[in-house]
Amino acid sequence: MDLENKVKKMGLGHEQGFGAPCLKCKEKCEGFELHFWRKICRNCKCGQEEHDVLLSNEEDRKVGKLFEDTKYTTLIAKLKSDGIPMYKRNVMILTNPVAAKKNVSINTVTYEWAPPVHNQALARQYMQMLPKEKQPVAGSEGAQYRKKQLAKQLPAHDQDPSKCHELSPREVKEMEQFVKKYKSEALGVGDVKLPCEMDAQGPKQMYIPGGDRSTLPAMGAMEDKSAEHKSSQYFCYCCKLSMKEGDPAIYAERAGYDKLWHPACFLCSICHELLVDMIYFWKNEKLYCGRHYCDSEKPRCAGCDELIFSNEYTQAENQNWHLKHFCCFDCDSILAGEIYVMVNDKPVCKPCYVKNHAVVCQGCHNAIDPEVQRVTYNNFSWHASTECFLCSCCSKCLIGQKFMPVEGMVFCSVECKKMMS
């Protein structure tokens, strides 16, 4: 398929999740409706991951595409109908062994994802070492957390040009090369094993905090150690604490098998969230989630959340923007050369600011223009003018004077305050 056809087929899937309730705004949101080019809801401005959108198949397609043309093809299966790679995530059902007596129902726990290991006991141990609120038990807070992190850490628009907004043929080609490069140089999936299992594969360099990683203790010296001391020879690369004997550890092949992590320590070095499904990116001796690895390589547009492959873009408020996406967060009007105000780190044009965000003057009850000086005390504001910042009793101008605030009113003296009591 040539680049022109790829550009024509680009779409953001606006029907996907339409009407889904917002888990954050509740009834304040009328239901999810995807903005034309921003990755947010048009109604409440929250992201899709904040809405109760059923995305199991879509997420499996996204992760499947991520693993396509990599060494991790064992984690995907292609649908016979359209050849789309699907992520074969390992769903684990654990049975609680309490059904020895009659009339006792079997208690089962379903995990929406579990490490793909043959030893179910090892997988169970892995899950128990995660914070309870992050264990992906079906229907739980942990399952919702996993779903949110899949959307946040592995955005589809970081790997698939068809999920981006109006890329040029040159940008499509550059993005495809970028994706191919990070798949071959940085992408990996963690491996859960017992540290002692790695010893069976031959001598390994062991990471010891503060030690010389290039040398190994003499084998004779290692054999003389007690079992208790042996268990302390393994240290977590993240927290630097020792690993307990018999506990599972996570290895990352790209990092080298001399490094290992506690399950709860296998985190992105930037956002410090659990690496979803143990999918990591390795760079400069650090773990990254997909989003923050890409951020370390390319600028990201603060408007559309996509990586910028254009040679021309703008920088404002310590953020990067496509030229066409430096727009008012409320009305989408272009802000280049216009006055704007930052509201919650989002640029808003002057008319929208006055209409939707400006504080109201306690004196004249009109919105205060962002370019006009004002006086603020607690949650109350006034125009800093002789017409507005006045004593609520005698109308004396209080600019530069002492005043007494009382529930949105200001007084020049105790006498004036008493007269208004």
From Swiss-Prot:
The keyword Ribosomal protein does not apply. Signal peptide: none annotated. Keywords: Cell junction, Cytoplasm, LIM domain, Metal-binding, Repeat, Zinc. Residues 155-164 have a biased composition (Basic and acidic residues). Residues 92-199 form the PET domain. It is found in: Cytoplasm; Cell junction, Focal adhesion. Residues 133-164 are annotated as: Disordered. One of its GO terms (biological process) is negative regulation of cell population proliferation. The keyword Cytoplasm applies. Residues 234-297, 299-359, 362-421 form the LIM zinc-binding domain. GO terms for cellular component: cytoplasm; focal adhesion. Its main location: cytoplasm. GO terms for molecular function: zinc ion binding. PROSITE patterns: LIM_DOMAIN_1, LIM_DOMAIN_2, PET. Belongs to the prickle / espinas / testin family. Interacts via LIM domain 1 with ZYX. Interacts (via LIM domain 3) with ENAH and VASP. Interacts with ALKBH4, talin, actin, alpha-actinin, GRIP1 and PXN. Interacts (via LIM domain 2) with ACTL7A (via N-terminus). Heterodimer with ACTL7A; the heterodimer interacts with ENAH to form a heterotrimer. PANTHER family: LIM DOMAIN-CONTAINING PROTEIN (PTHR24211), TESTIN (PTHR24211:SF1). Scaffold protein that may play a role in cell adhesion, cell spreading and in the reorganization of the actin cytoskeleton. Plays a role in the regulation of cell proliferation. May act as a tumor suppressor. The N-terminal and the C-terminal halves of the protein can associate with each other, thereby hindering interactions with ZYX. This is Testin. It comes from Plecturocebus moloch (Dusky titi monkey).
